Structures are given as C-alpha cells and as structure tokens.
C-alpha cells in the first residue's frame, strides 16, 4: 500500500496548549482519529511532535492520496493547521528510477 508523509503545523495562537477551544477539540482527537483512519483504510506508522515547534510529522499507509486528504478534512484539523503532503517512496525504488533516466550534465 502507498505511503504518504504529512507535516502539519499551526501558529502559536492556534496551539491547543494556548487556546482553550482548540484544547477541547484536540482532546477529542484521541478518540475521533482511530475510527476516522479506519474508515479511510489508513494505517498510521509514525505520528510524532517535532519539538519545540508547532509541527507534527505523520507517516501514513493509505490506499490513495484522496483517503489521506479526506481524513484530514473530516477530522477538522485543517481548520487550524496547515499541511504539507508528500508521496513517499523507498530509496530502492527512487534509485531504480534514477538509473533509468539519462543524465543531463
């Protein structure tokens, strides 16, 4: 199954540590996210906070990019976070693709 890397971030004033409304919403995510990921057939491999910033790194296994996008929207996380979204490949795969391409210099 394809892997996707997502980096989410928010400004300090949108941090659940500082904002009472977002703290309540953030606490709900502990119970809301697992069924939402299951609904979209997403398996989280890594979800870590990048200290001391306001960023989270996600490595997800998902059937397609749309499943990840839809999960983000349905969770409500996009209302207070920005997201960078990447397809992920193994180094073996990318090295094979590199060998298939002619050099340009």
Label each PLM-derived region with a short phrase:
Residues 78-90:
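Conserved short beta-strand edge segments in small beta-sheet-based binding/regulatory domains
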Residues 1-55, 63-71, 89-105:
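Short S/T/G/P-rich N-terminal loop/turn motif that feeds into the first structured element of a domain
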């Amino acid at each position: 199954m394809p892997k996707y890397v997502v980096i989410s971030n928010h400004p300090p004033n949108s941090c659940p540590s500082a904002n009472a409304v977002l703290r309540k919403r953030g606490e709900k995510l502990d119970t809301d996210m697992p069924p939402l990921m299951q609904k979209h057939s997403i398996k989280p491999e890594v979800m870590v906070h990048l200290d001391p910033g306001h960023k989270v790194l996600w490595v997800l296994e998902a059937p397609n990019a749309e499943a990840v996008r839809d999960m983000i929207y349905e969770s409500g996380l996009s209302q207070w976070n920005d997201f960078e979204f990447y397809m992920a490949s193994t180094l073996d795969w990318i090295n094979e693709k590199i060998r298939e391409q002619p050099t340009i210099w």
